[in-house]
Amino acid sequence: MNEYCFNLNLDIYPLRNDVSLDDLPKEQWNLISVDVINPDLLSFLKLKGINISVVSSFYDSGTNFEQKIHIDFPTMCDMTKLIWAWGEHHVMNWYMPEDQNNLEFVIDKNSTNPSNGIRNYSVYDRQSLNVVHTSKIGFPSLIQVGIPHQGINFAGVRRSLTVILHDEKNNVIPMNRARSIFKSYILP
């Protein structure tokens, strides 16, 4: 079992009934309102002691589109997102630095998203990293976003919706804890 991605058997559609995937922006990365999330999903997460505060949508079109290798925070940490991915021909790679004592592999710390100027994350140089895991993302999956990772779309359109998981004290939920919370939903 890997420590980067767990596909789930969770039959709750992420969006409200009156919100279509086509209603979401078609920019590469978008911060969207928690109000679009299905109330049944919010209730389910609340029962598990989980709050969400950040909801993002992604739109990757075209053949061989590669996101920049990045972490969803200014520095490496242990942070979990719940993700729903639409599309057939995509994977996510996770990376680790060749030399974890050398932080020169960060090429753009505290980067902002060009579409809205508010994103805070770090981009990495591929030359200094080794792939440690590759996986197709399920519908939904728990993914580790506190280490370098990258979505790759081979063909067609890839859409995804992600939520950062927080506990009741507003701390981000690390992957081992998320795996424990969702253990009865993890697919083999």
Task: Please describe what each predicted stretch is.
Residues S56-S57, I69-D72, I143-G146, V163:
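Short His-Asn-centered micro-motif
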Residues S43-T63:
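A short glycine-rich, His/Asp/Glu-containing loop-to-beta-strand
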Residues S61-I137:
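Catalytic core of non-heme Fe(II) oxygenases with the double-stranded beta-helix
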Residues N113-P188:
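Catalytic core of Fe(II)/2-oxoglutarate
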Residues E3, I52-S56, H89-N93, E98-N101, ...:
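Generic structural motif
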Residues E3, M79-K81, R158-S160:
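Short hydrophobic/aromatic beta-strand or adjacent loop that forms the aromatic wall/cage
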Residues M1-S43, F139, A155-G156, D167-P188:
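N-terminal auxiliary "cap/dimerization" subdomain that precedes the catalytic jelly-roll/cupin core
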